[in-house]
Design a protein with these regions (language model features):
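C-terminal interaction appendages of subunits in large macromolecular complexes
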Residues: 394-413, 428-433, 444, 448-450, ...
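Conserved short strand/loop->alpha-helix "switch" segment adjacent to the catalytic nucleotide/phosphoryl-transfer site
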Residues: 30-49
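Helical (often loop-to-helix) elements that flank the catalytic cores of nucleotide-handling enzymes
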Residues: 92, 347-360, 563-569, 573-574
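Short adenine-binding "F-helix/F-box" segment of the Bergerat
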Residues: 91-92, 99
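GHKL-family ATPase ATP-binding module
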Residues: 2-18, 25, 47-49, 57-59, ...
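A short glycine-centered beta->alpha linker in the GHKL/HATPase_c
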Residues: 85-90
Length: 654
């Protein structure tokens, strides 16, 4: 079911007058993290998204349908689109070409002038000038009015005025930039990270073709470069099917709406599966609003109201003995919500929560209309959904006891901490660390080796429950999972959602998974990460979850001892101290944490000055949702396919 409205090209003119100027560029180089998030992998890739966002603005306005992104041999990036081309005419106020203004002045651009773009993507709207400021070199070519115009820059400063360099029968913009290695700690682009975001953008913008080419990787057979094309004719409908592809569907239909209410374009796709979790991915102007906001609230309100009214009118709830709550309508629900807002207000800890109040009513109205129509037209599917809601309510009723067990042991009630927890003496969460350690024996060593001031230890017995396959109340009945909630000081239930984790009284801002460096250890890591992703995603979003990396080897030659985390480090030790002869060096392979004594464990894995921690991040929540359900869910087929495809990369420990 769907209701559709077409995008019509916006009639606003896009010329020098549309480019507005707000402030200078030096600030970007002084505090880059303020503008692009950080100066490592995330920020490096964010540069590409800023340029791509400009091309997508052209697509949203109806003028561009193809964007090409290329990672060049030297790790520079080229982005080309077939939009109208950035204006090059004279900018009255700034007394220079509009292109130069857009490239060299922060907060200059068509997105600040409502006439040229009704809505525009890009989180900060700092756009091209910000990328320019953070690049050692940048070249911009504009194809417009039958001509090619060009300007080059170094660290944001033009090398010459905009000049005409040729004729052209196409329109569009081509940008190439070289990220500045004096600012970025990482300057090598990761194909997978870019592919993941570009795939997401293709789903969010139906009919837009986005290609990604990696000129660093050549196919030996035909000499071509590694490349992919992302294109989705059906947009969100395909997106929600992609996320759901490894789950069992409750109904085969995608409930779809594409309409405009109160001047806000709204597109939503909904599917139901037989699972127990709610997975709603929401976007504003193509930005993933991880913390939700008014669009999500409007969606939930309409879903609950419409389904409840239909069930009551159809007399389906007459024999139900338990009370039905809003959460019950969302169990097994997967949805993607995409709204376009002219002036979005972002709130929350990571500035990814939509605050515009007018959006709530608009989404509520749109969803209410389309869902009511769908339920009336599809009574069989409607009954299946309502039956699932009743099942969820009954299970939730059974889960109340389990939830109360978690709640009752809240840290505020005093003496409610799990007996196995060896707590630290400092009470400032920002300084405290909790190690989740596999097994009692390793837990004992960790307790002896830690710094008691700020490091706490919680030993976990065996493998924790795979929450991907378990009903909600079963997960909460598991002792190990209850102990994690209690030790962390996390309770269940917030104002918005009775199932959501409440981390206001979180006791540690570093939660470190510490397991053996073998296959079993990796499996336990994955089970714990699955738990946090599904039950406490805020922990990952805030950057609180880490994985410890114990060394694989201890190499000795005479009096020289060195811990090695990789085979390459071990080989280097052999080359340096053993003349390249493996037999000349004594190597101890650590299979488990228990093989180290307390002092060794502290030196290698727990001491903040020497250890290596991997921070767990989610670059793309929708893709992570798909991967967790595929790797950890009930359906074996997609998992086997994934393993066969990736077997060459697998590190199999025998």
């Amino acid at each position: 079911i769907m209701s559709e409205e077409q995008i019509t090209p916006n009639n606003g003119s896009y010329s020098a007058d549309s480019i507005q100027v707000l402030e200078g560029l030096e600030a970007v180089r002084k505090r880059p993290a303020m503008y692009i998030g950080d100066i490592s992998v995330k920020g490096l890739h964010h540069l590409v998204y800023e340029i791509v966002d400009n091309s997508i603005d052209e697509a949203l306005a109806g003028y561009c349908d193809h964007i090409e992104v290329t990672i060049n041999e030297d790790n520079s990036i080229t982005v080309q689109d077939n939009g109208r081309g950035i204006p090059v005419d004279y900018h009255e106020k700034e007394k220079k070409s509009a292109l130069e203004v857009a490239m060299t002045v922060l907060h200059a651009g068509g997105k600040f002038d409502k006439g040229s773009y009704k809505v525009s993507g890009g989180l900060h709207g700092v756009g091209m000038s910000c990328v320019n400021a953070l690049s050692t070199h940048m070249t911009t070519q504009v194809f417009r009015d039958g001509k090619i115009y060009q300007q080059e820059y170094e660290i944001g400063k033009p090398l010459y005025s905009v000049k005409e360099v040729g004729v052209s029968d196409i329109t569009g913009t081509r940008q190439q930039f070289w990220p500045d290695d004096t600012i970025f700690t990482e300057t090598v682009y990761d194909y997978k990270i870019l592919a993941s975001r570009l795939r997401e953008l293709a789903y969010l913008n139906a009919g837009l073709r986005i290609s990604l080419t990696d000129r660093r990787v050549v196919n030996e057979e035909d000499g071509s470069f590694k490349s992919e094309v992302f294109y989705s004719e059906e947009g969100l409908r395909e997106f929600v099917r992609f996320i759901e592809s490894s789950r069992e569907h409750l109904i085969n239909d995608v409930i779809y709406l594409n309409s405009e209410k109160q001047g806000i374009p709204i597109e939503i796709a909904i599917m139901y599966n037989t699972g127990f979790s709610e997975n709603v991915h929401s976007y504003v102007n193509n930005i993933n609003t991880i913390e939700g906001g008014t669009h999500l609230a409007g969606f939930r309100r309409a879903l609950t109201r419409t389904l409840k009214k239909y069930a009551e009118d159809s007399k389906m709830l007459e024999k139900v003995k338990v009370e039905i709550s809003g959460d019950d309508f969302r169990e097994g629900l997967t949805a993607v919500i995409s709204v376009k807002v002219a002036e979005p207000q972002f709130e929350g800890q990571t500035k990814t929560k939509l605050g515009n109040n007018e959006v709530m009513g608009a989404v509520d109205q749109a969803v209410g209309e389309v869902l009511a129509y769908y339920l009336e037209e599809h009574p069989k599917e409607a009954k299946t959904i309502v039956d699932k809601v009743i099942l969820a309510a009954t299970a939730r009723h059974a889960a109340r006891k389990a939830r109360e067990m978690v709640q009752r042991k809240s840290p505020m009630s005093g003496g409610g901490l799990p007996g196995k927890l060896a707590d630290c003496s400092d009470k400032d969460p920002s300084k405290c660390e909790l190690f989740l350690v596999e097994g009692d024996s390793a837990g004992g060593t960790a307790k002896q080796g830690r710094n008691r001031m700020f490091q706490a230890i919680l030993p976990l017995r065996g493998k924790i429950l795979n929450v991907e396959k378990a009903m909600y109340h079963k997960a909460l009945e598991s002792d190990e999972i209850r102990n994690i909630y209690t030790a962390l000081g996390v309770t269940i239930g917030t104002e918005d959602d009775s199932k959501e984790a409440n981390i206001e009284k979180l006791r540690y801002h570093k939660i470190i998974i510490m397991t053996d460096a073998d296959v079993d250890g990796s499996h336990i890591d994955t089970l714990i990460m699955t738990f946090f992703f599904r039950y406490m995603p805020q922990i990952i979003q805030n950057g609180y979850l880490y994985i410890a990396t114990p060394p694989l080897y201890l190499c000795k030659k005479g009096k020289v001892e060195e811990y090695c985390w990789t085979d390459a480090q071990r080989q280097k030790f052999i080359d340096t101290y053993g003349g390249g002869l493996e037999n000349a060096v004594h190597t101890q392979r650590y299979k488990g944490l228990g093989e180290m004594n307390a002092q060794q464990l502290w030196e290698t894995t727990m001491d903040p000055d020497n250890r290596m921690l991997k921070q767990v991040n989610i670059d793309n929540a929708a893709e992570a949702d798909y991967i967790f359900s595929m790797l950890m869910g009930e359906d074996v087929g997609p998992r086997r396919e994934f393993i066969e495809e990736n077997a060459t990369y697998a590190n199999i420990d025998t």
